[in-house]
Amino acid sequence: MKRTFQPNRARRKKKIGFRARMDTSGGRRILSARRRKGRKTISA
């Protein structure tokens, strides 16, 4: 059986990168929540 995580740098950037997060209101909400929580990394 194939594993569920198939790493792909381009797809990762496109889906959960900083620019992708900043593109939508929901994404910006995610970033602010992670900043508020004090995450060391806020996006991929």
Curated annotation (Swiss-Prot):
Q: Where is this region: Disordered?
A: 21-44
GO biological process terms, alphabetically, are:
translation
Entry keyword set: Ribonucleoprotein, Ribosomal protein
The protein's matches in InterPro entries, at most eight in alphabetical order, are given as: Ribosomal_bL34, Ribosomal_bL34_CS
Question: Which is a Pfam family this sequence falls into?
Answer: Ribosomal_L34
Listed GO MF terms: structural constituent of ribosome
Write out the similarity annotation.
Belongs to the bacterial ribosomal protein bL34 family.
Against HAMAP family, the record matches this protein to: Ribosomal_bL34
Q: What is this protein called?
A: Large ribosomal subunit protein bL34
Q: Which organism is it from?
A: Endomicrobium trichonymphae
Q: Write the gene name.
A: rpmH
